[in-house]
Amino acid sequence: MNSKHSYVELKDKVIVPGWPTLMLEIDFVGGTSRNQFLNIPFLSVKEPLQLPREKKLTDYFTIDVEPAGHSLVNIYFQIDDFLLLTLNSLSVYKDPIRKYMFLRLNKEQSKHAINAAFNVFSYRLRNIGVGPLGPDIRSSGP
């Protein structure tokens, strides 16, 4: 991706066992597939993300799904300053979010994006709570 900006990879270390998770859900449409979707753990948070009612996630968060080789795909995203500050304040891991970032998809995830010809229909960040052992896992620490 030829860019004016430097994109930083969002690493797995932002996912901390025992804490609530923001899940990035992407729905694809088109290509050789029908209704392909991906659920990707995005960020461990101390409390749920709540955006102002009058705004949509797309007002703060833009994604672009691009090939990163013959069989691999990256998801690039640009984050508005308001959402950037909000995510970093909620994050369990200290200040992991930057304005320009990307995620590397594994081969199986990449296959879904390729089958849909990279055509994103919709995306969302969903709050996912912890399981029954979450507090115990959290107290034992990684």
From Swiss-Prot:
Molecular function terms from GO: identical protein binding; structural constituent of virion
Pfam families referenced in this protein's UniProt entry, alphabetically: Matrix_Borna
Principal subcellular localisation of the protein: virion
Residue numbers binding GMP: 64-66, 117
Species annotation: Borna disease virus 1
Function: Plays a crucial role in virion assembly and budding.
Protein name: Matrix protein
Record text on subunit structure and interactions: Homooligomer. Homotetramer. Interacts with phosphoprotein P. Binds to ssRNA.
Subcellular location: Virion; Host cytoplasm; Host cell membrane
Classification via InterPro entries: BDV_M, BDV_M_sf
Membrane topology of the entry: Peripheral membrane protein
Post-translational modification: Not glycosylated.
UniProt GO cellular component terms: host cell cytoplasm; host cell plasma membrane; membrane; virion component
UniProt keyword list: Host cell membrane, Host cytoplasm, Host membrane, Membrane, Viral matrix protein, Virion
Gene name in the database record: M
